[in-house]
């Protein structure tokens, strides 16, 4: 289900405040956040945001193609190691 247009996208207030401060100062720092549910907005373009994946903060450089997506989409939480190989020789 999509969000109402009159409400606008969800962006954590503390994250939006930090980005606006950096835009005013014209600085590029890594912003650490746990807010995976925040939507990427155009003011974030060009910044590096470290998103928590459950173990560590993964730095993600925001580009224009990411606008409209959630931060959590780019910080994977699970690692797929692959299925076990079937070893026919050891079964004999």
From Swiss-Prot:
UniProt keyword Transferase present: no
Name of the encoding gene: rps19
Gene3D superfamilies attached to this UniProt entry: 30s Ribosomal Protein S19, Chain A
NCBIfam families (UniProt xref): rpsS_bact
Name recorded for this polypeptide: Small ribosomal subunit protein uS19c
Matches recorded under InterPro entries: Ribosomal_uS19 (IPR002222), Ribosomal_uS19_bac-type (IPR005732), Ribosomal_uS19_CS (IPR020934), Ribosomal_uS19_SF (IPR023575)
UniProt entry keywords in alphabetical sequence: Chloroplast, Plastid, Ribonucleoprotein, Ribosomal protein, RNA-binding, rRNA-binding
Membrane-crossing segments per the record: none
Similarity comment: Belongs to the universal ribosomal protein uS19 family.
GO molecular function, a single term: rRNA binding
Lineage of the organism: Eukaryota, Viridiplantae, Streptophyta, Embryophyta, Anthocerotophyta
Cell compartments where the protein resides: Plastid, Chloroplast
Function: Protein S19 forms a complex with S13 that binds strongly to the 16S ribosomal RNA.
């Amino acid at each position: 289900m999509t969000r109402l247009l009159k409400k606008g996208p969800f962006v954590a207030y503390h994250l939006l405040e930090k980005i606006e401060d950096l835009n005013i100062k014209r600085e590029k720092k890594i912003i650490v956040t746990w807010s995976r549910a925040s939507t990427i907005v155009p003011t974030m373009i060009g910044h590096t945001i470290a998103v928590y994946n459950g173990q560590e903060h993964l730095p993600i450089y925001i580009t224009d193609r990411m606008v409209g997506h959630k931060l959590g989409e780019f910080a994977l939480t699970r690692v797929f190691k692959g299925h076990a190989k079937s070893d026919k020789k050891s079964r004999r």
